[in-house]
Amino acid sequence: MTSAPRRSPSRLPLAILWLTLLLAALLRFFRIGYQSLWADEGNSVAMAGRTLAEISTAAAADIHPPLYYWLLNLWVRVFGDSETALRALSALWGIVLVWLVYQIAVRLVDRRTALIATFFAAISPFLIYYSQEARMYEMLAALAGVLYYGLVRFILHENIVLPADGTGKTVSFSGLATGVIVVASIAGLYTHYTFLAIVGLVTLVYLLWVANSRRRGFVKIRLLHWGLLLIVIAFFYLPWAGTAISQLTSWPRTGTVVPLNEAISHILNLLALGPVSQLEPGSPWLSIFLLLFILGLWPWIRANGRRAHWLSWLLPLLAILVPVVMVLAGGLYKESYLKFLVVAAAPFCILLGRGVTGFMEALEKAAWKKRSAAPAVQSGRRRGAPTRGQPAKAARPAAAQPAAAPPVRDPVGRWLALIWLLIAVVLVSIPTVQTLAAYYFDPAVARDNYRGMAAYITAVGRPDDAIILNAPGQREVFEYYYDGPLPVYGLPEQRPPDAEATVAQLAEIARQHPHLYGLLWATDESDPQHIVEGWLDTHAYKATDTWQGNVRFVTYATQQDSDAWPRQEADIALDDQVSLTTYALSSREVESGDVLQLQLAWQAEQVPETDYTVFVQLLDQRNQVVAQHDAPPLSGERPTSGWQPGEIVLDNRGILIPPGTAPGDYRLIAGMYDPATGERLATEYADYIDLGSVRVNRPAVPPPPEALNMQNAERFSFDEITLLGNDRYKRGFRHEPDEPLRAGDLLHLTFFWRADVNPTAAWWFTARLVQGADTELAAVSGPLVSDLYPTLNWEQGEIVRGEHDLQIPDYVKPGRYQLQLFLHTGNPTDTIDRVILGRVTVSE
């Protein structure tokens, strides 16, 4: 351990520190309000809107103490409750934590280690993620850092004032360090219940220090002082202790049991790159972090000839192990509980920094020894002369000793150390930058998109529709974004759920509302019997089912008089395993944006070989898929492998006709396929069953742009027509738009058009894939929608979507290519404009 120098001999370290803190601030505030709040952040919003007394009452019934909510209450009074304002409090705690990493590491090890560890903390995806969340976890990590800082200062002060030989009449204690420990402990305990383990950890470390330094005396008074310190902490926590005991003993443990090596690998991934890491276990990039971690624990011999003090590696190691053991042994190993490990992220960065500088010193020392072949007097130190930090021994008379040369700093060792430093920082930074890029820009790893779901419901919801929140704990965050007129039902209302009461409520809701929008979140805890979704899947007609982060967003139609629908005979077998006996449609006509309801009556000819998926598709005259619904029978409630020969299963389906679908006649088909292989079951003539035609009509009111759910919402105006946006993905992978596109594949293009006037021409488009300046690799041309619905038939304000395929030739090499779009009246050379839609990646 070292004392932090009062004045730096150079301004460079201070400049590096301030630049690192600036980097930390930029990374924590960059796009901080871009992602939607998620459910737990909604709870924070609701708590912050209460009075301080109401917060205390509500927190007593929750698993989180009230301090963070109290601070957030005061914070929003000043800065408001926007996403940015709500999360800014955590961002500031995150910056404080980065500064604390420096203050701790500079005292535990040295300035060089502290600067490197601070840089690692500044760019840590784990710490950045929770710095951009309106929850208490970054504050928890920062308070743990404050406590570690107070402990280190406390021990350093004792190390200075304690006599080396145990003599002396009295010993003093650092008042500042004592105050820091007490305040940080009390604040931490009122922030999160796991902080009790942190207080126990620092107590253990202090006891180890006392045992190690017992020969320096004053053991009893030191233990008494620490005991009084703990009594003060307990006294101020006593008003909340009963609540804490009640919550900790009654809260359910819902962790999962996994092999220890798998858990450790996942935790390493989390500490290194946070919850959005895309690396697989065993990745070479994770090996870099593991290597630096091990090097950080190595007992390096310092430049002064001594081994590093045990506290410099034991404190950060225990600060990692204690929360990890708490999670693994306490039944808390679950994705939603691993955020408790954020308290270990800063100590992890300190050990990474120690691993870098420890090996740097080893390289410097090894190079110095290799070049030092001359007698000791020529190496800058006489044999037996004291090294820095060691007490001097009795020396011979000066006249009998040769003059000592000044110390020599070997340039080879310095260059080797700098090269190692550069390599280590780059190897840590590469996966870190990739992870941060995904976190900031990739919707696939974004938080639960309540903002988007609320906007969609606002755009498409009709006056008689309703919203179901399964679980009710989502209400706060959903109503943060949604202030529309539709009723919101939180189900199940009871905990544990009352199945009979919940089913009765669902039946009444379905009777009153023709369309339901469902937000399904944490259902294993709120609805472990799946009462809500199970009833809806068997009694309503599910139209969509998509993931919005960790929330499933579903839509249902609730037509109840299916017995009155015309029932069509089919009696068509699929590979002699399953037959479609009959089917019924709610109507042969439907408006775009509405749900076509379909009931399929399946009969098992034998026990099916596997669990098949049912598909229903609406096709245009070019066999382009306009609408589609793929799901197991009854959305998984009745898997086919459980069917018995002769059994008839009624399978309700809802097919959402996408807003903007052009008016016209479409073909409806259905069938089954093996989800493992994609292979369809076949009839005698085809691999699908033809269910006849469906007429799609123009809606009375054009859909708002929010209802289109466009992948790329960039607008371009072309005289009479505006392109509102477009979707691009490998054909057949609308549900996975990031599926790699390769040479020979079809790139599916969906264009969303709006007629700004009644068009006076039959407009066509040409889409080109271009390499370099203007080398065309592929192109597709045609009417904006189809020959059957030319733009001359469009009305002013009408929004229409066109579905097209662009063939990627086999000879196209992997790379990124420009996608261009032209509008013309049938002659591609007579264009009115050209726009660049972006770039398309062709993978290997």
Question: Where are the predicted features?
Answer:
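Serine/threonine-rich, low-complexity intrinsically disordered segments
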Residues: A4, W18, L162, K169-S172, ...
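Ser/Thr/Pro/Gly-rich low-complexity, intrinsically disordered segments
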Residues: I160-L162, A374, Q378, P407
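Short, low-complexity intrinsically disordered segments enriched in A/P/G/S/L with frequent Arg
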Residues: D165-V171, A373-P375, G384-P386, Q390, ...
